[in-house]
């Protein structure tokens, strides 16, 4: 992360609005949570570990003065997904946007070495979780003419080594998002995708496990560094969910520092 980044000023575009963020208590998801909170949004944040969610709630509420509702859920379990949506909407009254960020996978494992369990981990935590959250959030988003921002990855766009199950889940999310954009457009609900390349706890672990691949990745980024989760990823999610992007739907935005250059 570049320590010389300029100070960012926020416009409170989401003051009085309510946003659901999966995996919003840590990593890139925490950066997204901070970005929406800085714009005045009240949040429903989900994850598997209550202590991390409660810590994020305390810190976000203290810094930004918004309300945060933490709810534990396994995104791959449809019944559990219903809980954060119902609980959050009950406390916050409405839902204006959903950001599906959470994902688990067996990275660094070649396709021929992948097990069904490896694939299930990626598909259930990513593709199924995104499907379940979209499906059950839609009735509320329809009422507010809301927006969905889903997370995919350069792993699928560019065929990254050792990422077959992760790429499969993420490309499934991209395809599903485009279909949803077509189906939900008449109801005023927009659906877009971001493919981030951001520094996070998971990436730091990957750096430790695969230092040579990490250095090769850094060298392939024209801007020379990974994104800041809040400023570089979260603020784009805010834009896509805001009125400024009211005519943007079904799109994939690559946030790769130039490493995702395409014709």
PLM region spans:
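Short C-terminal tail/terminal secondary-structure segment
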Residues: 9, 108, 158, 219, ...
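Conserved glycine-rich cofactor-binding loop
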Residues: 18, 25-27
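Active-site helix of classical SDR
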Residues: 134, 169, 177
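Residue(s) in the substrate-gating loop at a strand-loop-helix junction
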Residues: 153
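Short, small/polar-rich loop/turn modules that mediate ligand/substrate recognition or access, typified
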Residues: 185, 190, 248-250
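Catalytic Tyr-x(3-8)-Lys segment
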Residues: 212-231
